Amino acid sequence: MITKSSGDGVHWPSLIGALHEYAVVGRRVKVLSSALSSLIPPQARVLDVGCGDGKLDRFILRQRPDASIEGIDVLVRPKAQIPVRRFDGVTIPYPDSSFDAAMFIDVLHHTPDPLAILREARRVARVILIKDHFRNGFFAESTLRLMDWVSNARHGVALPYNYFSQSQWSDAFAELRLNVREIKTTLRLYPPPASWLFDRSLHFVARLEASAPS
């Protein structure tokens, strides 16, 4: 919904957000559900960390009815489309090895310490699926900040703009002893001509697996 500012002008975050919702969100859900559903282990119990309303999970389950997905979030939405449990954003409220896989879909760059919550995910699941960004190339930082602001500012989501370069992600995975088993970098989340600016090499989906204890 487009709202008014306190004066007579249009509230621009709401207007731009509404246009983004119309042009991008539906496509994003379809593209990501397809990309992620192929990476989930067979008959997996999956935890979606920072699941939001669970709409993406519902689309994944249409393609993977053998799996089950439940979520955790710092804010539990009243009409979430999967079971959701509240958590503090730091400690995942489940015992070790409770899940076959954990997912972070555009969540880690909203956290102050991505490695800390990834370490928690590694504790509860051996397979970790990530959709996030690469801060690589000219204007990557400013482009990612713009996308984040358009998508999230009107919802009151924290925006620390904590983007990693590809080499920083590689270092983080190595530190946590997470092996990259598959990675997708051509996602086509945006229709042309927006894709020329907002797709590029800024997005990735990855499947990681924890190394066996030595």
PLM segments and residue spans:
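Class I SAM-dependent methyltransferase Rossmann-like catalytic core
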Residues: 3-34
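Glycine-rich helix-loop-beta junction characteristic of Rossmann-like nucleotide cofactor-binding loops
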Residues: 35-41, 92-93
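Class I SAM-dependent methyltransferase SAM/SAH-binding core
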Residues: 47, 52-91
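C-terminal alpha-helical "lid/dimerization" subdomain adjacent to the S-adenosyl-L-methionine
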Residues: 58, 133-195
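A conserved beta-strand element that flanks and buttresses the S-adenosyl-L-methionine
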Residues: 103
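A short His-aromatic
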Residues: 106-110
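A short glycine-rich, Lys/Arg-flanked "PGG" loop and its adjoining helix->strand segment in the class I
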Residues: 115-128
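Core SAM-dependent methyltransferase catalytic element
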Residues: 191-214
